[in-house]
């Protein structure tokens, strides 16, 4: 579930971040709203936040409360450049937040009872959107311009996220969780039906070759879930 109206909280949370740096309990509590939400979700095994592509105040508050995050990637230069911003920003937020919480007096700490007392977020991995390939004689052909960018991903992920966020300098962990091709009309169909793609049926408009694509999507998600579990 979600609503665009949540964006109206952006300025409020942004202003209260200044209170965190001043160790004001009000700003700390307001920026811990997602800590509080997760505390109320203890009957669930997993809680997922589907975030927009921004380093704004709402996403900051979400990330500080989460155990892990996954980043989507595209085969374009902007995705590569964004990794540095994500790594630097999240490292700074995490350090500032944990330092403030560690220095709270006992009275203020009691007001946060039942919530996590530090940000422990780790980078879990990335999923990239496959580019649309050219076809020649029925065979898909790679596009060198896209492949050049994709080849940079593992090293950039290691440098900006694995090392900065996870302190993983070994280079042994595979952070590529999987890739997703373009599913064209199945995506708006899924949104209109309020269902995941793998749950779409003829009632939702699935016909002909759509069924194979629904099965393909389900198989891809299974692969990604297994990779997440292994990481």
Regions found by a protein language model. Name each.
Residues 23-34, 79-83, 213-225:
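Phosphate/oxyanion-binding active-site loops and adjacent basic polyanion-contact surfaces
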């Amino acid at each position: 579930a979600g609503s665009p109206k949540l964006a109206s909280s952006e300025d409020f949370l942004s202003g209260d971040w200044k209170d965190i740096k001043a160790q004001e309990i009000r700003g700390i509590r307001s920026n811990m709203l997602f800590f509080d939400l997760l505390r109320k979700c203890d009957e669930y095994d997993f809680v997922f936040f589907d975030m927009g592509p921004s380093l704004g105040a709402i996403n900051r508050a979400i990330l500080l409360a989460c155990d892990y995050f996954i980043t989507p990637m595209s085969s374009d230069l902007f995705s590569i450049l964004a990794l540095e911003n994500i790594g630097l920003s999240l490292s700074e937020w995490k350090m500032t937040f944990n330092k403030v919480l560690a220095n709270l007096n006992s009275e203020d700490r009691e007001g946060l009872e039942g919530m996590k007392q530090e940000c422990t977020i780790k980078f879990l991995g990335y999923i990239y959107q496959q580019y649309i390939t050219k076809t020649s004689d029925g065979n898909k052909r790679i596009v060198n311009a896209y492949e050049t960018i994709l080849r940079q991903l593992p090293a950039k992920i290691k440098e900006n996220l694995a090392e900065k966020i996870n302190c993983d300098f070994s280079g042994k962990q595979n952070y590529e969780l999987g890739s997703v091709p373009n599913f064209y009309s199945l995506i708006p169909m899924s949104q209109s039906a309020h269902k995941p793609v793998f749950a779409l049926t003829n009632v939702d408009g699935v016909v002909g070759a759509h069924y194979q694509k629904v099965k393909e999507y389900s198989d891809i998600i299974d692969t990604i879930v297994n990779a997440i579990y292994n990481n």
